[in-house]
Each structure stands twice: as C-alpha cells, then as structure tokens.
C-alpha cells in the first residue's frame, strides 16, 4: 500500500503525524459524501489507535498514539467520544478549522 503525506505538515508535527493526517482527511472526505457522522457541526471519524495500526503496520501503537496526540495538541484535530455504549472508549476525530485549512492547502499544492 502506498501512503502520502504533506512535507510542510511533517516538518511541523512529524512524519507519522503527517501520514495519519492525510489518512484521516481522506477517510473523513469519503465519509462526508457517503454517510457523514455529524456532531457539533463537524464530520467525525470513529477510529481506534489499534485500528489505525492495522492500516499502518510500520507504526507501533505508541507511535500512532503519540502522532495523534501531537495533531490534537497542535489543534489540527479535535477528539471526542460519541459512542452509544458508555463503556466504549473509542475516540472520534474531526479536523478543526485550522486543520481543514492545512489539509485544503496541502491538496492545493498537490494538484
């Protein structure tokens, strides 16, 4: 499988975070056209760290968790929990306005 990332995002947040940001952006864009999960006016993606390590076998659980933490701390992503079952602690991710700007800018450079 081929993975892409934006070098400007990688410089600021790290290569792992840039790879995850592009993956999440693609998933959320696809979801927004198929069956959007809307909460708080944003399209959210429910995805556990364990699930992401399945898509990225070259990243460990901790590397994935740390990369997501950097994106949340850098205000590229926001994290929430909208699970129907209370004890389900799977996180949901959405791009902030700043994150949407970064990803749209990234797409503009690649086209």
Explain the meaning of each model-derived region.
Residues 1-54, 97-100:
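Short recognition helix of helix-turn-helix/winged-helix DNA-binding domains
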Residues 69, 96-111:
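Charged low-complexity intrinsically disordered patches
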């Amino acid at each position: 499988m081929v993975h892409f990332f934006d070098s400007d995002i990688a410089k600021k947040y790290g290569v792992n975070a840039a790879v995850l940001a592009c993956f999440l952006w693609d998933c959320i864009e696809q979801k927004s056209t198929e069956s959007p999960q809307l909460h708080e006016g944003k399209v959210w993606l429910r995805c556990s760290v364990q699930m992401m390590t399945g898509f990225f076998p070259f990243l460990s659980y901790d590397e994935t968790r740390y990369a997501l933490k950097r994106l949340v701390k850098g205000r590229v992503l926001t994290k929430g929990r909208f699970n129907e079952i209370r004890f389900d602690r799977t996180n949901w991710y959405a791009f902030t306005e700043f994150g949407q700007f970064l990803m749209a800018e990234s797409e503009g450079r690649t086209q």
